[in-house]
Amino acid sequence: MEALEEKEAQVAAWLKKIFGDHPIPQYEVNAWTTEILYNLSERNRIRDRDVYLVTEDLKQKAKEYESEAKHLQDLLMESVNFSPASLSSTGSRYLNALVDSAVVLETKDTSLASFIPAVNDLTSDLFRTKSKNEEIKLELAKLEKNLTATLVLEKCLQEDLKKAELHLCTERARVDSRLQNMDFLKAKSEEFRSGIRTAEEQLSARGMDASLSHQSLVALSEKLAELKRQTMPLKKKLESYLDLMPNPSLAQVKIEEAKRELDTIEAELTKRVNMMEL
Protein backbone atom coordinates (compact mmCIF):
# COMPACT_ATOMS: atom_id res chain seq x y z
CA MET A 1 0.00 0.00 0.00
CA GLU A 2 2.85 2.36 0.87
CA ALA A 3 4.56 1.51 -2.42
CA LEU A 4 1.39 2.43 -4.34
CA GLU A 5 1.07 5.74 -2.50
CA GLU A 6 4.73 6.48 -3.20
CA LYS A 7 4.22 5.78 -6.90
CA GLU A 8 1.13 8.02 -6.96
CA ALA A 9 3.10 10.84 -5.35
CA GLN A 10 5.95 10.40 -7.86
CA VAL A 11 3.47 10.36 -10.76
CA ALA A 12 1.77 13.52 -9.48
CA ALA A 13 5.12 15.30 -9.17
CA TRP A 14 6.15 14.17 -12.66
CA LEU A 15 2.87 15.34 -14.21
CA LYS A 16 3.18 18.71 -12.47
CA LYS A 17 6.70 19.04 -13.87
CA ILE A 18 5.53 18.09 -17.39
CA PHE A 19 2.47 20.36 -17.58
CA GLY A 20 3.88 23.21 -15.50
CA ASP A 21 1.30 25.96 -15.07
CA HIS A 22 -1.22 24.16 -17.31
CA PRO A 23 -3.93 22.07 -15.64
CA ILE A 24 -3.31 18.34 -15.51
CA PRO A 25 -5.93 16.36 -17.52
CA GLN A 26 -8.35 14.37 -15.41
CA TYR A 27 -7.84 10.62 -15.32
CA GLU A 28 -9.04 7.72 -13.24
CA VAL A 29 -6.60 7.06 -10.43
CA ASN A 30 -6.23 3.34 -9.84
CA ALA A 31 -3.46 0.78 -9.59
CA TRP A 32 -3.38 0.14 -13.35
CA THR A 33 -3.17 3.80 -14.48
CA THR A 34 -0.72 4.59 -11.68
CA GLU A 35 1.56 1.74 -12.78
CA ILE A 36 1.49 2.88 -16.43
CA LEU A 37 2.21 6.52 -15.55
CA TYR A 38 4.91 5.46 -13.10
CA ASN A 39 6.68 3.45 -15.83
CA LEU A 40 6.43 6.43 -18.18
CA SER A 41 7.87 8.75 -15.53
CA GLU A 42 10.77 6.35 -14.94
CA ARG A 43 11.53 6.15 -18.66
CA ASN A 44 11.32 9.93 -18.90
CA ARG A 45 13.68 10.29 -15.93
CA ILE A 46 16.18 7.87 -17.48
CA ARG A 47 15.99 9.67 -20.81
CA ASP A 48 16.51 13.06 -19.16
CA ARG A 49 19.49 11.66 -17.30
CA ASP A 50 21.00 10.28 -20.54
CA VAL A 51 20.41 13.60 -22.32
CA TYR A 52 22.01 15.45 -19.43
CA LEU A 53 25.06 13.18 -19.52
CA VAL A 54 25.44 13.57 -23.29
CA THR A 55 25.07 17.34 -22.98
CA GLU A 56 27.67 17.50 -20.24
CA ASP A 57 30.01 15.32 -22.31
CA LEU A 58 29.61 17.61 -25.31
CA LYS A 59 30.25 20.65 -23.16
CA GLN A 60 33.38 19.01 -21.79
CA LYS A 61 34.58 18.15 -25.31
CA ALA A 62 33.85 21.72 -26.44
CA LYS A 63 35.97 23.05 -23.60
CA GLU A 64 38.74 20.63 -24.53
CA TYR A 65 38.58 21.67 -28.19
CA GLU A 66 38.65 25.34 -27.22
CA SER A 67 41.63 24.72 -24.99
CA GLU A 68 43.39 22.79 -27.74
CA ALA A 69 42.62 25.52 -30.27
CA LYS A 70 43.97 28.20 -27.93
CA HIS A 71 47.08 26.11 -27.35
CA LEU A 72 47.64 25.75 -31.10
CA GLN A 73 47.10 29.47 -31.65
CA ASP A 74 49.63 30.28 -28.95
CA LEU A 75 52.03 27.77 -30.46
CA LEU A 76 51.68 29.40 -33.87
CA MET A 77 52.24 32.83 -32.42
CA GLU A 78 55.34 31.72 -30.54
CA SER A 79 56.87 29.72 -33.40
CA VAL A 80 56.10 31.68 -36.57
CA ASN A 81 54.30 34.73 -35.19
CA PHE A 82 51.11 33.66 -37.01
CA SER A 83 47.52 34.21 -35.93
CA PRO A 84 44.25 33.38 -37.76
CA ALA A 85 43.19 36.96 -37.11
CA SER A 86 46.08 38.17 -39.25
CA LEU A 87 44.85 36.24 -42.32
CA SER A 88 43.30 38.03 -45.26
CA SER A 89 39.67 37.46 -46.16
CA THR A 90 40.74 34.96 -48.84
CA GLY A 91 42.96 33.13 -46.40
CA SER A 92 40.16 33.04 -43.85
CA ARG A 93 37.82 31.53 -46.42
CA TYR A 94 40.41 28.89 -47.30
CA LEU A 95 40.97 28.09 -43.65
CA ASN A 96 37.23 27.83 -43.00
CA ALA A 97 36.82 25.60 -46.05
CA LEU A 98 39.64 23.38 -44.80
CA VAL A 99 38.02 23.13 -41.38
CA ASP A 100 34.58 22.42 -42.86
CA SER A 101 36.05 19.71 -45.08
CA ALA A 102 37.71 18.08 -42.08
CA VAL A 103 34.40 18.15 -40.21
CA VAL A 104 32.47 16.68 -43.13
CA LEU A 105 35.08 13.98 -43.76
CA GLU A 106 35.34 13.33 -40.02
CA THR A 107 39.15 13.42 -40.01
CA LYS A 108 41.14 13.72 -36.83
CA ASP A 109 43.06 16.72 -38.24
CA THR A 110 43.59 18.75 -41.42
CA SER A 111 46.76 16.99 -42.55
CA LEU A 112 47.10 15.53 -46.03
CA ALA A 113 47.57 12.06 -44.53
CA SER A 114 44.09 12.34 -42.99
CA PHE A 115 42.40 13.90 -46.02
CA ILE A 116 43.55 11.34 -48.64
CA PRO A 117 42.06 8.20 -46.98
CA ALA A 118 38.88 10.12 -46.17
CA VAL A 119 38.52 11.27 -49.78
CA ASN A 120 39.22 7.73 -51.01
CA ASP A 121 36.53 6.37 -48.72
CA LEU A 122 34.13 9.05 -49.92
CA THR A 123 34.94 8.20 -53.55
CA SER A 124 34.29 4.51 -52.86
CA ASP A 125 30.99 5.38 -51.24
CA LEU A 126 30.14 7.50 -54.28
CA PHE A 127 30.87 4.62 -56.68
CA ARG A 128 28.81 2.23 -54.56
CA THR A 129 25.97 4.72 -54.49
CA LYS A 130 26.14 5.17 -58.27
CA SER A 131 26.13 1.40 -58.76
CA LYS A 132 23.16 1.07 -56.45
CA ASN A 133 21.39 3.85 -58.32
CA GLU A 134 21.96 2.03 -61.61
CA GLU A 135 20.51 -1.15 -60.13
CA ILE A 136 17.52 0.81 -58.87
CA LYS A 137 17.07 2.41 -62.32
CA LEU A 138 17.11 -1.02 -63.99
CA GLU A 139 14.63 -2.33 -61.47
CA LEU A 140 12.42 0.70 -62.02
CA ALA A 141 12.59 0.18 -65.79
CA LYS A 142 11.48 -3.45 -65.33
CA LEU A 143 8.68 -2.36 -63.04
CA GLU A 144 7.55 0.30 -65.52
CA LYS A 145 7.58 -2.28 -68.32
CA ASN A 146 5.59 -4.73 -66.21
CA LEU A 147 3.24 -1.93 -65.19
CA THR A 148 2.68 -0.97 -68.83
CA ALA A 149 1.97 -4.58 -69.76
CA THR A 150 -0.36 -4.90 -66.80
CA LEU A 151 -2.23 -1.74 -67.77
CA VAL A 152 -2.59 -2.97 -71.36
CA LEU A 153 -3.83 -6.34 -70.11
CA GLU A 154 -6.24 -4.61 -67.76
CA LYS A 155 -7.60 -2.50 -70.62
CA CYS A 156 -8.05 -5.60 -72.80
CA LEU A 157 -9.79 -7.40 -69.96
CA GLN A 158 -12.09 -4.43 -69.43
CA GLU A 159 -12.97 -4.40 -73.13
CA ASP A 160 -13.58 -8.18 -73.08
CA LEU A 161 -15.71 -7.74 -69.98
CA LYS A 162 -17.78 -5.05 -71.70
CA LYS A 163 -18.23 -7.31 -74.74
CA ALA A 164 -19.19 -10.22 -72.50
CA GLU A 165 -21.69 -8.06 -70.62
CA LEU A 166 -23.18 -6.82 -73.91
CA HIS A 167 -23.38 -10.39 -75.23
CA LEU A 168 -24.93 -11.50 -71.95
CA CYS A 169 -27.55 -8.76 -72.16
CA THR A 170 -28.34 -9.76 -75.75
CA GLU A 171 -28.59 -13.43 -74.83
CA ARG A 172 -30.70 -12.61 -71.79
CA ALA A 173 -33.09 -10.59 -73.98
CA ARG A 174 -33.20 -13.45 -76.48
CA VAL A 175 -33.88 -16.00 -73.75
CA ASP A 176 -36.57 -13.77 -72.27
CA SER A 177 -38.16 -13.45 -75.71
CA ARG A 178 -38.05 -17.22 -76.19
CA LEU A 179 -39.53 -17.76 -72.75
CA GLN A 180 -42.32 -15.35 -73.58
CA ASN A 181 -42.92 -17.11 -76.90
CA MET A 182 -42.85 -20.46 -75.11
CA ASP A 183 -45.38 -19.25 -72.58
CA PHE A 184 -47.51 -17.93 -75.42
CA LEU A 185 -47.25 -21.22 -77.32
CA LYS A 186 -48.06 -23.19 -74.17
CA ALA A 187 -51.11 -21.03 -73.60
CA LYS A 188 -52.18 -21.42 -77.23
CA SER A 189 -51.55 -25.16 -77.10
CA GLU A 190 -53.67 -25.46 -73.99
CA GLU A 191 -56.31 -23.30 -75.66
CA PHE A 192 -56.30 -25.56 -78.73
CA ARG A 193 -56.51 -28.69 -76.55
CA SER A 194 -59.42 -27.19 -74.67
CA GLY A 195 -61.08 -26.23 -77.97
CA ILE A 196 -60.55 -29.73 -79.36
CA ARG A 197 -61.99 -31.33 -76.23
CA THR A 198 -64.97 -28.97 -76.33
CA ALA A 199 -65.53 -29.66 -80.03
CA GLU A 200 -65.24 -33.42 -79.49
CA GLU A 201 -67.71 -33.24 -76.61
CA GLN A 202 -70.14 -31.24 -78.75
CA LEU A 203 -69.76 -33.62 -81.69
CA SER A 204 -70.12 -36.60 -79.37
CA ALA A 205 -73.31 -35.07 -77.97
CA ARG A 206 -74.61 -34.72 -81.51
CA GLY A 207 -73.96 -38.40 -82.20
CA MET A 208 -70.63 -38.18 -84.04
CA ASP A 209 -68.86 -41.48 -84.57
CA ALA A 210 -66.04 -41.90 -82.04
CA SER A 211 -63.79 -43.03 -84.86
CA LEU A 212 -63.75 -39.43 -86.16
CA SER A 213 -62.31 -37.96 -82.95
CA HIS A 214 -58.95 -36.26 -82.93
CA GLN A 215 -57.16 -39.18 -81.31
CA SER A 216 -58.80 -41.66 -83.67
CA LEU A 217 -57.88 -39.62 -86.72
CA VAL A 218 -54.30 -39.31 -85.47
CA ALA A 219 -54.21 -43.08 -85.02
CA LEU A 220 -55.67 -43.56 -88.52
CA SER A 221 -53.08 -41.21 -89.95
CA GLU A 222 -50.34 -43.22 -88.30
CA LYS A 223 -51.95 -46.42 -89.57
CA LEU A 224 -52.10 -44.95 -93.09
CA ALA A 225 -48.42 -44.15 -92.94
CA GLU A 226 -47.73 -47.70 -91.76
CA LEU A 227 -49.86 -49.16 -94.59
CA LYS A 228 -48.05 -47.04 -97.13
CA ARG A 229 -44.77 -48.29 -95.74
CA GLN A 230 -46.00 -51.89 -95.94
CA THR A 231 -47.32 -51.47 -99.51
CA MET A 232 -44.02 -50.14 -100.80
CA PRO A 233 -42.54 -53.65 -101.22
CA LEU A 234 -45.76 -54.74 -102.93
CA LYS A 235 -45.53 -51.84 -105.37
CA LYS A 236 -41.92 -52.73 -106.14
CA LYS A 237 -42.87 -56.36 -106.57
CA LEU A 238 -45.80 -55.32 -108.78
CA GLU A 239 -43.49 -53.25 -110.94
CA SER A 240 -41.30 -56.30 -111.44
CA TYR A 241 -44.34 -58.26 -112.59
CA LEU A 242 -45.11 -55.63 -115.23
CA ASP A 243 -41.99 -56.68 -117.08
CA LEU A 244 -43.17 -60.30 -117.38
CA MET A 245 -44.37 -61.40 -120.87
CA PRO A 246 -46.69 -64.43 -120.13
CA ASN A 247 -50.43 -63.74 -119.88
CA PRO A 248 -50.28 -59.96 -119.94
CA SER A 249 -54.07 -59.60 -119.88
CA LEU A 250 -54.44 -61.48 -116.60
CA ALA A 251 -51.57 -59.59 -115.09
CA GLN A 252 -53.11 -56.31 -116.16
CA VAL A 253 -56.39 -57.26 -114.49
CA LYS A 254 -54.64 -58.13 -111.23
CA ILE A 255 -52.72 -54.89 -111.35
CA GLU A 256 -55.85 -52.86 -111.88
CA GLU A 257 -57.58 -54.64 -108.99
CA ALA A 258 -54.63 -53.95 -106.69
CA LYS A 259 -54.55 -50.30 -107.77
CA ARG A 260 -58.27 -49.88 -107.12
CA GLU A 261 -57.96 -51.50 -103.70
CA LEU A 262 -55.03 -49.24 -102.83
CA ASP A 263 -56.84 -46.15 -104.12
CA THR A 264 -59.91 -47.08 -102.02
CA ILE A 265 -57.83 -47.36 -98.86
CA GLU A 266 -56.04 -44.07 -99.53
CA ALA A 267 -59.32 -42.29 -100.33
CA GLU A 268 -60.94 -43.52 -97.10
CA LEU A 269 -57.98 -42.41 -95.00
CA THR A 270 -57.72 -39.08 -96.80
CA LYS A 271 -61.43 -38.48 -96.19
CA ARG A 272 -61.02 -39.11 -92.47
CA VAL A 273 -57.94 -36.87 -92.28
CA ASN A 274 -59.81 -34.09 -94.06
CA MET A 275 -62.71 -34.42 -91.65
CA MET A 276 -60.23 -34.14 -88.77
CA GLU A 277 -58.84 -30.90 -90.21
CA LEU A 278 -62.37 -29.47 -90.56
From Swiss-Prot:
Coiled-coil regions listed in the entry: 53-81, 124-152, 183-277
Subunit and interaction comment: Component of the HAUS augmin-like complex. The complex interacts with the gamma-tubulin ring complex and this interaction is required for spindle assembly. Associates with microtubules. The interaction with microtubules is strong during mitosis, while it is weak or absent during interphase. It is unclear whether this interaction is direct or indirect. Interacts with EML3 (phosphorylated form).
GO BP terms, alphabetized: cell division; centrosome cycle; spindle assembly
Cellular component aspect of the GO annotation: centrosome; cytosol; HAUS complex; mitotic spindle microtubule; spindle pole
Recorded family membership: Belongs to the HAUS1 family.
InterPro entries linked: HAUS1 (IPR026243)
Gene from which this protein is expressed: HAUS1
Compartmental location: Cytoplasm; Cytoplasm, Cytoskeleton, Microtubule organizing center, Centrosome; Cytoplasm, Cytoskeleton, Spindle; Cytoplasm, Cytoskeleton, Spindle pole
Lineage, opening ranks: Eukaryota, Metazoa, Chordata, Craniata, Vertebrata
Protein name as it appears in the record: HAUS augmin-like complex subunit 1
Function recorded in the entry: Contributes to mitotic spindle assembly, maintenance of centrosome integrity and completion of cytokinesis as part of the HAUS augmin-like complex.
